[in-house]
Amino acid sequence: MSGHSKWANIKHRKAAADAKKGKLFSQLSKEIIIAAKHGGGNPETNPRLRAAIERAKEANMPKENIEKAIMRGIGAIPGVAYEEVTYEGYGPGGVAIMVEVVTDNKNRTAAEIRRIFTKHGGSLGEAGCVAWIFEDKGSIFIEKESVKDEDQLIADALEAGAEDVQISGDSVEIITSPENFSEVKNVLEEKGYKITQAEVTKVPKNVVPVDGPDAEKVLKLMEELEDHDDVQKTYANFDIPDEILQSLS
């Protein structure tokens, strides 16, 4: 299982804790606002908004919160003016890191993100310094208990247009192209597989093995970035031993 997938699986399991802290709803609300702002308030004609609403519903976000976020996005009701910013940099061991934020104050957020990088032995870089290392992919996690036959799952996923199926322990992840993401997700749901998380994300084209003190520093860096209120998503190309990753979960 790739370093990306192991980390993605741990983040997925930590989502419940994020929800309890209230951060998940804040992230989802900001994503809906931004999606509606740039593509309009109709999910039928705005794929990004449709995906954001689906994620919000899966997280049991109240309907009124979703509707309010859409209205704020299209400017129908007043609210804070948010904008998207992507930061790029390096962590310990030369790990490439991308951080997507939604903020109402770019200067404040940039200073805080830079401080987090520096605190944990990393450095914030210029725009484009690591973006080339990542590519967009669809990521679909399936509840292991809903998989009766792993070979059949692999066949179903590949037939639907998936690029890869990664099974490890209690984790099952389907990787797709962005274009085939929705089709594969729909087919798997129709066949009875229980999807626990699905999104278009960024996957590294190559990974950097990291161990020992550097591995712990990288994980602390990633955790603090993800705990920041303005951070929506983080991506990194590390490959860290399972025992160190599991100590985080």
Swiss-Prot record:
Keywords: Cytoplasm, DNA-binding, Transcription, Transcription regulation. The keyword Magnesium does not apply. One of its GO terms (cellular component) is cytosol. InterPro entries: Integrase-like_N, TACO1_YebC-like_2nd/3rd_dom, TACO1_YebC_N, Transcrip_reg_TACO1-like, Transcrip_reg_TACO1-like_dom3, YebC-like. One of its GO terms (biological process) is regulation of DNA-templated transcription. It holds the Pfam family Transcrip_reg. GO terms for molecular function: DNA binding. It is found in: Cytoplasm. Belongs to the TACO1 family. HAMAP family: Transcrip_reg_TACO1. This is Probable transcriptional regulatory protein DICTH_1505.
